[in-house]
Amino acid sequence: MAIHLYKTSTPSTRNGAVDSQAKSTPQKQKSLIYGQHHCGKGRNARGVITTGHRGGGHKRLYRKINFRRNEKDISGRIVTIEYDPNRNAYICLIHYGDGEKRYILHPRGARIGDTIVSGTEVPISMGNALPLTDMSLGTAIHNIEITLGKGGQLARAAGTVAKLIAKEGKSATLRLPSGEVRLVSKNCSATVGQVGNVGVNQKSLGRAGSKCWLGKRPVVRGVVMNPVDHPHGGGEGRAPIGRKRPTTPWGYPALGRRSRKRNKYSDSFILRRRK
């Protein structure tokens, strides 16, 4: 990923850094695009804010991504590499030999004109999708299935990559990008390689307005709120939070407290927790 730094001509662009990687800008594939009605903006069915700092943002069209890679043994050609406003990874349009067209996540290093294929007896090369049982140990993978046939659910963000470290019995052992080591069925499929747009964390929006375009509203500290709005609020001047430990706006412990449900069914598949 190529990062372009703005010239310091205005205060808003002085600290900006944007992605300048070459992407094709074709007409969108209309059969794979549809609109979504976003009216919640972080609210639940009662209109109560359950996820903060969401709202506004530019209007988007959703691109239907093929996470299942279910065109078995049919080779496809990468026609475009496109920006997707709904995720931080790029997507690429694939034209398959039977006439089908699909969007998939862009693997790192893939270029327009490259050929990919999915199936059981396909080469272990970048962009190909195949079951874990047919992969060799140490293979870098992404878009990994947890449930057979449901489609990839793990390692889908920009720059993420997992590693196949063991195969025993009916399960395969994976090291995920978070550092977690877990078991997955060997029959689940995954895509070889790393997700593209690796340097996404080097981008700097430079100003608050660019953040608002993404649908992210300002973050306000609880200590500067009123007592009715946050447990940390109130007091005269710069007052401390008045508690032994920080809490969420609803009074639950924050900053370090594990929020994962105890005795969850998938605990038996996790060999080592994430870092």
Swiss-Prot record:
Pfam families xrefs: Ribosomal_L2, Ribosomal_L2_C
Ranges annotated as biased composition (Polar residues): 21-30
This protein's UniProt keywords: Chloroplast, Plastid, Ribonucleoprotein, Ribosomal protein
GO molecular function, one term: structural constituent of ribosome
SUBUNIT field: Part of the 50S ribosomal subunit.
NCBIfam families in the cross-refs: rplB_bact (TIGR01171)
Family that this chain belongs to: Belongs to the universal ribosomal protein uL2 family.
Protein name as catalogued: Large ribosomal subunit protein uL2c
Organism: Illicium oligandrum (Star anise)
Taxonomic classification: Eukaryota, Viridiplantae, Streptophyta, Embryophyta, Tracheophyta
Gene: rpl2
